[in-house]
Each structure stands twice: as structure tokens, then as C-alpha cells.
Amino acid sequence: MNTIKTLLLSSLSIFTIVTANAQSFKEPVAFKLKNGMNIIVSENDRSPKAYASFTLDAKDFEGKKDGIVELLNAVLNENVAKNSNLSFKDNSGKLAVATASLDEELSGMAALIQHASINQQNFNTAKAKLLTSLKAKDYDYDQSVNEESISALSLSDVKAFYAQVSPEKTYLTIAGDVELNNAKASAKKAFGNWSTYSHQESSILTK
């Protein structure tokens, strides 16, 4: 449970919804979907919105190339429509929406993660933007994310890493103005049909 709380609080700090009144948070509830995906739900009826964070389980990706997660996030961002409530940064996908829209928006997030378009154009654009940001030093990236590590990564590296991402290696945190049963249903609807096979097939199709 300590690991769950750490992950939850880390996610909440990204969304800047932690208030002075910590008592508004209920004890987080953790469970797994049938495909092995880890889900954490924390209700906070004082929050103005519903939030979701999609993260990778770091221990399942030991030995990965430096900067690969941040570059994959940058490529995924090229798949996100303008003015979207979804963004990929800080090694995670983040969603902030009105509670009534959570079900629909979470399904959209899942579809993008499972069937991202990873091609040369998106890769080149994402890599250029990330390198520009690193040169400008306009964001506090992890020390492994630097001009040298990003420059060394290829489209093949990103595709290979993306193909390794599967449900049992990921966490979905849902928090804020949500009701537990509704959050469970939304998570199952959005990610319940995700399988390693379908994800790898999608990666092959983007070649």
C-alpha cells in the first residue's frame, strides 16, 4: 500500500490538485484488470475535476535507453489533437477533465496509447521539439534526458520500446471528483480489451 500511496501522491502533484485539507481524500483503492493492468482510484469530492495518469512500471523496463520514455511521450503528443485535455510529459500521460466527460476522454486516451501513429514524420517533429526544449533549458527534465541521449535515439528505438509496453507493465491512476464504481467501470471500458498482441500488432502497422 505504501507503493500505491507514493505513486498516487506523485500523480496528484503533477495535476496540482493536492489541497491543504488532506482529509478530503479517501483511502486509495488498487486493483487489476483481467489483462494485468494496475488501476488505482482515489476519491476526492473537493476536487473540481477528474484526473487520470498513465505511467509505466519502472522495474519492468530496467536497462532501457536513456531518454527513450520522454521521446516516446513526445511522439505520442504528436498524436494528440490541439486543445485536447490530454498530454504526455514527465514519463506519463495526463488527463484533466470534467467528471461527466471522464468515461469518454479516458477511452480516447486508451485508444491513442494502444494505437499510436509512430512514423518518421511524427518522430522527426517530436525529436526536434524535445531537443529545442533541452537546448533552451525551459523544463526540468530527468538527468538522463539530455541532448546527447535524445540525439542518439532512432525511430527504430522508439518503435521497439513502444512494442514492449503492455497492460501488466503499466499503472492507471484515477483521482479527484470521481466515484469508485464509476471509475472502475470507465477504466475497464477504456483499457479492458487491451492486450499485448493487439498493441504489438499496432506497432507493426505503423512501420
Please provide the spans of the model-predicted regions:
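Hydrophobic h-region of N-terminal signal peptides that target proteins for export
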Residues: 12-20
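Charge-rich, well-structured scaffold segments of protease-associated domains
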Residues: 2, 81-200
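Bacterial N-terminal signal peptides that target proteins for export
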Residues: 1-11
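His/Glu-rich zincin catalytic helix
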Residues: 4-5, 20-83, 163, 167-207
